[in-house]
A protein has these predicted regions:
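Surface-exposed binding patches on compact interaction domains or structured appendages
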Residues: 1-13
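A short beta-strand micro-motif common to beta-rich folds, especially ectodomain repeats
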Residues: 10-12, 21-33
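C-terminal edge beta-strand
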Residues: 34-46
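N-terminal carbohydrate-binding accessory modules
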Residues: 46-118
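An active-site-proximal structural segment forming one wall of the substrate-binding cleft
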Residues: 53-55, 98-119, 129, 133-163, ...
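Hydrophobic faces of well-ordered beta-strands that scaffold small-molecule active sites
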Residues: 69-75, 119-121, 157-161, 199-203, ...
Length: 325
């Protein structure tokens, strides 16, 4: 008879405890004359008074959250409007400068009622920024008010830095620009640290280095340099957020590929940032076919003529081929 011990593994599952009381049980294991009792305890269910907008779900993957986001819309031409002709005495002057009405709770609720489940809130923080890179409290308050309207509708929100590419592009090589980028993101992180899974951060918008490299000009070394700068920006952003307080340690984040162009997502020169939380997704802007997505119907330019409709067999094939990359 062999004396080699035999190991058996059994998985025992029970229904979740939905009562306010601790549940106890004893599991008895017997093999021949050997009997072993194991006492187990199931914690009581504690109903949290914390609103859902402050909740972080420990086991929620970023992929699952992206699926929750569903159909989204961009709150463009509002908090991201820029221009040296805009009267800086009120944040609402920026909000209306490009033709938008003042954003109201009813507008945000209207998006939700129309079927949108996520809202991107682009912000040009530099509009009201002090010389020592402090965001004006009126702008921060306004962003938070719109954010709360969004979250209270059950929508997912995205906040970024928008329309400030000129100085953001200098961050990898200029210490002052890096200080500015770091300061803005630290303030965003501090202000919104209590918010949960339904708030994502995005570092910037459509950053590219055409002066260094484009698909039509420049060497492979130039391309590596240009894409490398965007990699550096992404990593700096992730590091800032993860080293801040509150729920930011586990916040789901978006990071950018070069020019947010889909084809660079699978370019070997693109590097996903190191993230201890492993909660990252790529943001991609898809303007294909350009004669429909960019040009107006009948508009004529040197590279094409705008069309008013989309949905041909060729259109679907192109879309499906790109999404399968």
């Amino acid at each position: 008879e062999s004396s080699t011990p035999v190991q058996a593994i059994y998985n025992i599952t029970v229904e979740p405890n939905t009562t306010p009381d601790v549940r106890n049980a004893t599991i008895t294991v017997s093999v021949k004359e050997h009997v072993q009792e194991i006492n187990v305890e199931q914690a009581a269910y504690i109903q949290s008074d914390e609103p859902e907008k402050y909740t972080v779900r420990e086991n929620l993957t970023t992929h699952q959250l992206i699926n929750e986001m569903g159909l989204g819309i961009n709150l463009g031409n509002t908090l991201d409007a820029v221009g040296d002709w805009i009267d800086p005495s009120s944040i609402l002057n920026y909000e209306q400068a490009w033709g938008s009405p003042v954003i109201t709770q009813e507008i945000i609720e209207g998006y939700a009622k129309a079927g949108y489940s996520s809202l991107r809130i682009p912000v040009s923080w530099g509009n009201l920024l002090s010389d020592d890179f402090k965001v004006h409290p009126d702008l921060m308050d306004r962003v938070e008010k719109i954010l709360n309207w969004t979250l209270d509708c059950g929508m997912v929100a995205i906040i970024n830095i928008h329309h400030e590419n000129e100085w953001i592009k200098q961050v990898p090589t200029d210490s002052k620009a890096k200080e500015k980028f770091t300061s803005i993101w630290k303030q965003i992180c501090e202000r919104f640290e209590k918010y949960g899974d339904h708030l994502l951060f995005e570092p910037m918008n459509e950053i590219g280095y055409d002066e260094i490299w484009t698909p039509w000009s420049g060497s492979e070394a130039d391309k590596a340099k240009a894409l490398g700068y965007v990699n550096d920006l992404n990593q700096l952003f992730v590091d800032i957020v993860r080293n801040s307080g509150g729920n930011n340690a586990k916040r789901h984040l978006l990071v950018e590929i070069y020019n947010t162009n889909l084809e660079y997502a699978y370019d070997p020169l693109f590097k996903m940032p190191n993230d201890p939380a492993n909660r990252l997704a790529l943001t991609v802007h898809y303007y294909t076919p350009a004669d429909f997505a960019i040009l107006g119907g009948g508009e004529v330019v040197d590279w094409g003529v705008g069309r008013e409709s989309w949905g041909t067999e060729a259109d679907f094939k192109e879309l499906n081929d790109n999404m399968d990359l």
